[in-house]
């Protein structure tokens, strides 16, 4: 629990540090609870860790999912941490690899939207326009880095065919 409370200090402790990871087992032991499979017992720690990591500009990785017979629960857990902004998931079994890759690899829909956002922001910025819509969604400069990150992840995953 102390590590979670000191997450920002840990993230800023060294320029050589590139990321942090949550240990669900240690955390639940400290809180005198147990891992349930729902992830509720880890939610506060996960939020604190990802906020600290982002504030410090480092990556954040989630804890292992220990119930190897519950692949549906594992999938839900990975979807949750992906939506929270984690960079990855620690795994303990080869059967878990494909699910993590599937969830963390941008879809073609994600890629197409990200390309539109990047191109539109570049064009609108040159015209002095700060807020506009893409596919009916309000967009401003705050969305630029996320769109670029989607494209970079697509490139790293080998699924990007675009020209950005």
Describe each model-derived feature in a short phrase.
Residues 1-164:
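Expand to "…catalyze enediolate/carbanion chemistry for C-C bond making/breaking, isomerization
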């Amino acid at each position: 629990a102390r590590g979670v409370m000191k997450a920002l200090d840990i993230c800023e402790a060294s320029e050589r540090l590139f990321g942090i990871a949550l240990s669900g087992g240690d955390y639940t032991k400290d809180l005198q609870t147990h891992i349930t499979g729902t992830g509720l017992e880890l939610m506060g720690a996960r939020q604190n860790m990802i906020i600290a990591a982002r504030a410090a500009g480092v990556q954040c990785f989630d804890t292992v999912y220990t119930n190897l017979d519950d692949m549906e629960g594992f999938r839900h857990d990975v979807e949750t941490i992906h939506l929270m902004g984690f960079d990855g998931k620690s795994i303990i079994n080869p059967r878990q690899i494909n699910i993590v890759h599937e969830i963390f690899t941008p879809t073609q829909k994600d890629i197409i939207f990200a390309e539109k956002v990047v191109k539109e922001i570049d064009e609108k910025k040159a015209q002095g326009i700060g807020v506009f819509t893409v596919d009916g969604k309000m967009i401003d400069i705050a969305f630029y880095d996320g769109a670029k990150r989607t494209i970079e992840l697509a490139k790293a995953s080998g699924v990007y065919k675009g020209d950005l």
